[in-house]
């Protein structure tokens, strides 16, 4: 699967809880595609998987890495993972594990390693907030340049 993708989620301002959440999938094989809840996090350099999901998927670590998170550092397992976005595009990633996600409703935190592969935008009109991601990138989104061109 190597198709362009577009993800768009629209929220009412009152529905936003400080983060963007989408329903995505982990691809194990053609007969094993697991639905997950993913939080998009521009403050995270890499994608993170919950310890609970590691156990559920039966993943084995390929190594260890030091991870910095909210003022603390810890050693984390590193795993190969295939993230399926918009049920179209598979991203083969090396992700770290965190038990901090276990107490949330999130299975995966999508970091800048994925976000920087495409175009990412959040816009607001009135009470509506729109999150969009497209892959591959179709060029820079530059609001200042758009104003100059008007």
Short names for language-model regions:
Residues 1-150:
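Pepsin/retropepsin-fold aspartyl endopeptidases
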């Amino acid at each position: 699967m190597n198709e362009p993708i577009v993800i768009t989620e629209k929220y009412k301002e009152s529905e936003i809880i400080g983060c963007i959440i989408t329903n995505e999938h982990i691809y194990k094989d053609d007969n094993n595609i697991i639905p997950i809840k993913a939080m998009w996090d521009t403050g995270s350099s890499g994608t993170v998987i919950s310890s609970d999901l590691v156990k559920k998927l039966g993943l084995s670590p390929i190594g260890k890495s030091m991870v910095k998170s909210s003022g603390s550092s810890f050693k984390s397992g590193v795993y190969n993972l295939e993230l399926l976005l918009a049920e179209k595009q598979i991203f083969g990633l090396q992700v770290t594990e965190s038990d901090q996600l276990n107490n949330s409703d999130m299975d995966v935190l999508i970091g800048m390693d994925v976000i920087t592969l495409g175009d990412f935008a959040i816009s607001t009109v009135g009470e509506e907030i729109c999150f969009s991601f497209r892959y591959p990138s179709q060029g820079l989104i530059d609001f200042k340049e758009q104003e100059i061109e008007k």
